[in-house]
Design a protein with these regions (language model features):
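Class II aminoacyl-tRNA synthetase catalytic cores and aaRS-like
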Residues: 1-343
């Protein structure tokens, strides 16, 4: 699937964009993408990456770091901004407000004006909570240079990832850090399952027919199982996604049971399918692309609305057909529906 996709896009770039350079298709796992970029659709033209520093700051006196240093499902990260000391106070305040919109409580930072002199050349509102050894370890970890600025974020995984991935994108664009014209990327090894926080039940991240990367892992922790699902990303935009499907009856049955589907329900809903698998099924998979989004990227436009003939409004109304509109009584009767008006 990936090989066919890569050949297809090499041809698209050559014939539509007249792009004759060799196209590089990068690959990154889902966990690596979250760890380095905070999202599963990074733009690799942007050199900014997150660095985990929980081990470095676990014993400092800064309460924000201490609160998350020992918590599960939490992160403490550092983000180096090249020549970030040139940012104004307003710039830093604007970035702080940006991450707050995504749940972050704030945005701590240190300025590395002269890294050879930690005592006087490194300044920060939180410096009094950090020893010189800790500061030096952070500088080494992110490979900071003179005039760089280092932002910090500490919170649960979701908030850190959501807020810092947006910050990476914003800073990369604002400071003109993007390198090259195109970034074509495969994101692989997505988790097979996730935990529904409301029901506390295991659910499929994609769908229950996605093949596990290693079927033997189904006997272990469901939340640690990787799948054979993949996304195709161009310049930080998800263009397509797909998976290799399950072709084994035994594996499919195990998946259903992990999802809490008992034998009776399994036979009622999927008996025909499991029976078909028992006769032998070749390995198979696929991918689906968002053509509208692809056109937007190829035309280097900022909004998908620009390439849709009759885009919906933000309230999902269609100005051309004036839909959605009310259904008449005959239409409702055909569907065995009735409307209930609010009193």
């Amino acid at each position: 699937v990936m090989s066919i996709t890569e050949r297809l896009f090499a041809r698209i770039f050559k014939e539509i964009l007249n792009y004759n350079d060799i196209i590089k298709f990068d690959r990154i796992t889902y966990l690596e993408a979250l760890n380095k970029y905070g999202c599963d659709k990074p733009d690799l033209r942007n050199p900014l990456v997150l660095h985990n520093i929980k081990d470095i700051v676990k014993d400092v006196e800064f309460k924000v770091f201490l609160d998350y240093a020992t918590k599960k499902d939490s992160r403490i990260v550092a983000l180096k901004v090249p020549n970030g000391c040139d940012l104004s106070r307003k710039d830093i305040d604007d970035y702080t407000e940006l991450v707050k919109r995504f749940g972050a409580k704030g945005l701590a930072y240190i300025k590395c004006e002269n890294i050879s002199n930690i005592e006087d050349g490194v300044t920060s509102p939180i410096k009094k909570f950090l020893t010189n050894d800790v500061l030096q370890s952070i500088i080494n970890k992110v490979d900071a240079n003179n005039n760089d600025l280092i932002f910090f974020s500490a919170d649960n995984n979701k908030i850190v990832n959501n807020s810092m991935s947006v910050l990476i994108k914003e800073i990369g664009v604002n400071l003109g850090l993007l390198q090259g014209e195109w970034s074509l990327l495969w994101v692989t090894d997505y988790p097979l399952f996730e935990l529904d926080t409301k029901t506390k039940q295991i659910t499929s991240i994609h769908h229950p027919f996605t093949s596990p990367k290693n079927p033997d892992d189904l006997d272990g922790d469901p939340l640690s199982i990787s799948s054979r699902a993949y996304d195709f990303v161009i310049n930080g935009n998800e263009i397509g996604g797909g998976s290799i499907r399950i072709h084994s009856k035994d594996v499919q049955t195990k998946i259903f049971k992990l999802l809490g589907i008992n034998d009776e329900e399994m036979n009622a809903k999927f008996g025909f399918f499991l029976n078909a698998l028992s006769y032998g099924c070749p390995p198979h998979g696929g991918i689906a692309f968002g053509i509208d989004r692809l056109a937007m990227i190829l035309l280097q436009l900022d909004s998908i609305r620009e390439i849709i003939a009759f885009p919906k409004t933000q309230s999902t109304a269609c100005l051309m057909t004036e839909s959605p509109s009310e259904a008449n009584n005959q239409q409702l009767a055909e569907l065995s529906l009735k409307t209930i008006k609010n009193k």
